[in-house]
Every structure is written in C-alpha cells, then in structure tokens.
Design a protein with these regions (language model features):
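Anion-binding catalytic surfaces of enzymes that hydrolyze or transfer phosphate/sulfate esters
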Residues: 1-128
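Feature marks hydrolase-like catalytic cores characterized by long aromatic- and Gly/Pro-rich stretches
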Residues: 72-73, 77-237
C-alpha cells in the first residue's frame, strides 16, 4: 500500500475523486472519521487524524501538533451562529488581551482531541498483546507561561509573558490522576516536588533537566551517563 493511501482520511467522492488517480482512502479512514468527523474544517482535528495514521503505519514515532492561530468558522450556517466557530482565534487580541476566556475555549478542544487519539490508539494492537496507547505519551505544554496578576474584580484581563509554567502529561506510562508540585494560592506561581516520592515541596523549583529526564524515564529511555537526574516520581512504578 502506498503512503498516500495509508494517510488518506477523505473518502473517494465526486468532489474528491481519488479513484481517478489510482488512489483510495486509508483502511483506517472510517474509524478515524468516526472519532474526528470535522477534519475538513477543523485544523486541530485534521492534525490529530494525520498524527494517528502516521503512528499506526510506523511512519513516525513523534508528532508535534497544536491549535491554529486562524479564526475558522462553519460558513454553511448563519454568520457566526451558535456553535459555528470551529477554531477560535489565538492571535494577539485573544492570547494576550483575553487570555482567560481564550484558554477556557481552547482547553476543551485540546482535551477532546487527546481523548480521541487515546481511543484510536487503544484500539490499535501493537503486535505483542499491548495497544499502541500503552506505549504512547501525550505532552501538553506552551512555549511560555503568563503573569499571574489579576486586576481587582476583573473577569477577563490582559497578561504578559512569564517563565513560570506547568505541563500536563497523558499516558499509561506515568502515574495517573496525579498532581506533582502545586500552585501557591497567594502568588499563582508553581512550586516543585520531591523527585523520588512526588511529595509537594513548596520551597523547590523544578529545572528543565529534571522534567526532561522524567519524561525520558517514563518512556523507558536509558539516561545513564547523560548527567540527567533520576526522576522516579514521574514514571509509573
């Protein structure tokens, strides 16, 4: 089977005549469309669909994806009708000036896509009695944090950049339903955790090498000789 066919989500149709070019939809396309039905309009769903197929057919072992900055809406409905916005804007006005409301909308999209990917990967046999999801890690992070100051009484407000941040990891390879570290309720800033036990440590700030090493350890990568610290709290025992 050629690579184009393996990765083809769209079905053969009059508007998209694959058969005229000797092509066909992927054998997994129907299952993918059932989970991500809006790939034609939703750039995040389209990325997720392609990500699954790249993993399924062993074309790639690592995928980077994220919401588009573009404002996308379903123009088949009345202009900006309820639920017609497919991809909310993430450019300056939304990410800086309306950060809180923008985050609220985009988190829902990210979680839905993660849930869909997990479902598809769980149904995919790795070949040894385990599923592809059993060997997958989804790492959610931004390129920077946001300042934590809220103007008195404000429901929405502008934010500047901050080096203080947190990440989320979804995987059977890490301890589930677990918060490592925490957030100081007085400052909104994060604090760290004990690398061995995972116990919160309000006086500790985690370093990049520690988090990086913890992710590699959860994936089973041997970091001996690298100088990276051991982070057993970040991997499932």
């Amino acid at each position: 089977m050629d690579l184009i066919t393996k990765l083809m989500v769209k079905p053969d149709s009059e508007d998209f005549p694959l058969s005229e070019f000797g092509l066909s939809e992927s054998p997994a396309a129907e299952a993918v469309r059932a989970v991500f039905p809006n790939t034609a309009l939703d750039p995040l769903e389209a990325q997720a669909a392609l990500a699954f197929l790249l993993l399924k057919y062993r074309v790639s072992v690592s995928i980077t994806m994220g919401p588009s900055f573009d404002f996308v809406y379903d123009d088949s409905q009345q202009f900006l009708a309820d639920n017609s916005v497919i991809n909310p804007p993430l450019a300056f006005d939304s990410s800086h000036q309306g950060h809180r409301s923008g985050q609220a909308v985009v988190w829902n999209r990210i979680y839905r896509v993660i849930d869909g990917l997990a479902a598809l990967l769980q149904a995919e046999d790795f070949g040894d009695g385990t599923s592809m999801w059993d060997r997958t890690m989804i790492y959610v992070a931004s390129d920077f944090g946001r300042e934590k100051k809220r103007p008195s009484g404000a429901n929405d407000w502008g934010t500047g950049h901050s080096v203080n941040n947190g990440v989320q990891v979804f995987s059977p390879l890490v301890p589930g339903d677990t918060l490592l570290g925490g957030v100081d309720g007085n400052t909104g800033l994060t604090y760290g955790f004990d690398p061995t036990t995972g116990a919160p440590d309000t006086g500790r700030t985690m370093s990049e090498p520690e988090i990086f090493s913890g992710l590699l350890g959860a994936l089973g990568v041997d970091t001996s000789g690298s100088g990276l610290p051991d982070m057993p709290a970040m991997r499932r025992s």
